[in-house]
Amino acid sequence: MSKIYRHIAGGSDEQIGHIDPEHGYVYSARFGPDKYIGWVNYEKGYVYSHQLGPDKYLGWVDVTQGKIYANRLGPDQYLGQVEQDGKLYRHEPGGRDTYLGSLTDMHHPVEGAAALLFFFNDEEAEAGEVANNDDSADKTKGKAKSNKPSN
């Protein structure tokens, strides 16, 4: 099982989710049973968000380079990359990429894409933070808040 950790400067990294490699199911960690939020397609490198009706296609990973792209109207947006050792980085145009966290026991680069798209994608995270004790937080689609400091 791949475990997803958010980097905390000067402290222990926090586990925020995990991926079941047998089925590709993605779960958000919370108090009580973890919440199913989506799945990955290992053959194609695609990531899907679970929702009522058809699941939503979020993005994909270039398995040879570990580059992660979000699905957008027009050209897909480059978000960042996952390294072979499971380290996740957000792309910062004109600057050094930001280290976000890591995956332990990563089986395929698409697991890194799922971590970035579900837990570290600012655009998706603006909808709100995953409610740890409330299943009615469907508006968040399982996204957790970014680790960027708010002003």
Regions found by a protein language model. Give the residues of each.
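Central antiparallel beta-sheet cores of small beta-barrel/beta-sandwich binding domains
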Residues: I19, Y27-Y42, Y48, K56-V61
